[in-house]
Amino acid sequence: MLIAYIDEVGEPGAFVSYDHAKFKTSPVFGYAGFVIPEERVHDFSRQVTQTKKDFFSFLHPADDYIPTWERKGAELVQKGAMERTKGRREILALRDLLEKVPAAGGSLFYFVREKAIGTPGQVWGSAPGSPETRSRIEERTLKCLAEAINRLCTHADNKNQNILLFQDMINESQRKAQVARSYANIYARMKEHQEMRRILEAPAYIDSELSSNIQCADWIA
């Protein structure tokens, strides 16, 4: 069996440009992470934990490591990181860790869709923060998650393996919507797409504070 860990790439809201006052976070949205054989999950988790300890020691050399401490990917891989001594050490440590994924029989996963450029009014004809805009953002998230699941199922089928999927914790209303949509997508596609039988359940959600592998998916995303 394969185990997949994924996290969101960017955010699903509107995007205008990187220098726009409000809509400047990300021109794409999707999911990224890694897939690894079940028998290598524990070993790789220990390697991720060690890398996280290394990150902590780079940034807080005089302090004791805190197991629930997180190093967010957005902070880790930021502009100019390689030009700073601590940032360079982190990037090189992350590179060394990710090289161990294929060595463990796993694969990196990355899927994004480019957003239509414009404010919510320009793209959807709705005001920022309005119910219509929130609904559009939720729909973008659900469609991208469904496509990520489709692609992970295809990968699992190519490997002749079943798969389980884990992602970072989100709020309860979002979780319920995503689980319901994921089940609907999986079962609706099964008749014509046999690879969908490879995924045994809809995604499960784990807090990245508690799961080293979910933390690693965040670094990749």
Model-identified regions with their sequence ranges:
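Phosphate-ester processing/binding pockets and catalytic centers
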Residues: 1-221
